[in-house]
């Protein structure tokens, strides 16, 4: 039996990805096309007002100063990458470009998830399925996590990118990949709380992948290090802010609140 040309296979796979993404855009548009409401509408209007009265570079400088406040522990929580940056806000000037931004970020996160699935399964079919499932999860992100500016999608994007760097580190043994993985995990945790969950999932993944607890800890160490650094900032910010972010050891209460939040998301 004659083998299929690899170039044709890659082209066919690309067409399938585009077809799934096109279907996802139609599926997602009901959820992600609505204008921002509530607190998100207020924050977006505030940002756009500042951008309208300043030059781009003035706003970028103001944005950088606001993010530095997180590293100086002057904010109640450590999420310096939570809000869209000055470049991202350029897409928020019209509802059409705003929708395209949300769709693009969602698609980029789903694509990286599919690459992780491809590496784990060594199957393009499984990777394509993971791509579709990640896109299908976007409505849960939007409804349950206030993703008017793609916060959970961006968190997932950085987390999946850090996982891919771990695979490169595992293959090449080049420490530079470990450094990049740690930085990406730090950004993921500094974007939204789910970044911490993804970092712990990375540990679980590598324990299974290496079939060893010690091997999993060693392989996932960069991501865990990035998570630990973000948590130190977050914990220190909570202590200084005094806004209810203190570390709680009331496990039953933590479990109750977690279940309530998950139920609200669904």
Pin down the residues of each PLM region.
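Transmembrane-helix motifs of polytopic, lipid-linked glycan transferases
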Residues: 100-122, 161-165
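Aromatic- and kink-enriched transmembrane "portal" helix at the membrane-lumen/periplasm boundary
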Residues: 95, 99, 127-161, 165, ...
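Membrane-interface transmembrane helices that cradle and orient dolichyl/undecaprenyl
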Residues: 159-178
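Start-transfer (signal-anchor) and selected internal transmembrane alpha helices
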Residues: 1-27
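Membrane-lumen/periplasm interface segments of multi-pass, membrane-embedded glycan/lipid transferases
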Residues: 37-47, 52-90, 227-266
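Structural signal for the C-terminal ends of transmembrane alpha-helices
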Residues: 28, 118-121, 165-171, 204-213, ...
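Membrane-interface alpha helices of multi-pass inner-membrane proteins
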Residues: 177-192, 202
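Perimembrane helix-loop-helix junctions
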Residues: 197-227, 231
């Amino acid at each position: 039996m004659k083998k299929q040309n690899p170039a044709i296979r890659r082209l066919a796979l690309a067409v399938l990805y585009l077809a799934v993404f096109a279907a996802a855009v139609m599926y997602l548009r009901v959820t992600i096309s609505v204008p921002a409401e509530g607190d998100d509408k207020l924050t977006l209007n505030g940002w756009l007002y500042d951008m309208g009265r300043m030059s781009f570079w003035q706003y970028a400088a103001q944005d950088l100063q606001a993010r530095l406040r997180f590293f100086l522990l002057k904010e109640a929580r450590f999420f310096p990458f939570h809000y869209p940056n000055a470049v991202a806000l350029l897409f928020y000037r019209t509802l059409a470009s705003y929708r395209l931004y949300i769709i693009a970020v969602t698609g980029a996160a789903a694509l990286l998830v599919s690459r992780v699935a491809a590496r784990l399964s060594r199957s393009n079919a499984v990777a394509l399925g993971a791509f579709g499932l990640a896109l299908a999860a976007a409505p849960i992100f939007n409804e349950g996590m206030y993703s008017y500016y793609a916060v959970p999608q961006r968190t997932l994007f950085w987390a999946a990118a850090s996982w891919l760097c771990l695979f490169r580190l595992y293959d090449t043994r080049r420490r530079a990949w470990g450094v990049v993985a740690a930085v990406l995990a730090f950004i993921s945790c500094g974007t939204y709380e789910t970044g911490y969950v993804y970092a712990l999932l990375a540990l679980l993944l590598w324990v299974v992948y290496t079939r060893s607890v010690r091997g999993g800890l060693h392989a996932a160490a960069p991501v865990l290090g990035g998570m630990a650094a973000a948590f130190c900032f977050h914990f220190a910010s909570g202590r200084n802010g005094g806004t209810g972010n203190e570390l709680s050891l009331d496990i039953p209460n933590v479990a109750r609140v977690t279940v309530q939040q998950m139920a609200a998301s669904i």
